[in-house]
Amino acid sequence: MYSESFSAAIFGIDGCVAHIETDISEGLPGLVLVGYLSSEVKEARERVRIALKNSGYRFPPKKITINLSPADVRKDGTSFDLSIAVAILAAFGYIDKEILKQILFIGELGLDGNIKSVNGVLPRVYTAYENGFKYCIVPFDNVCEAG
């Protein structure tokens, strides 16, 4: 099972679209993140897993592989959590995969499943606009910054 979602990375003072690809397969159960990732992004593995569990989602024991691209741009911070969670939910059939092509997601997940504010929202939202996304989902506390 495959799905994809989108977020944005900060590259200098600009943003760039981050493509979140998720594959669900047979194998040793677990969640693996791959890409050019900071430690905060690698820690998303646990934040997302626990946030989804505490939000009431249950999944069969499967191997979940998540690739964050482009590979040549370092992904920093916690703003990818929401997009990773959405991609997992889509891969398991909870969310329509087609609608995700129109949305860029920004936000950190708390262990309780709540969406937390993040830094650098404005250049990320502008990146969504520049790249033709119809919607950009941001944390409530970042709405004023998002414009």
Predicted regions and their residues:
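Peripheral, non-AAA+ core regions of ATP-driven protein-machinery
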Residues: 1-147
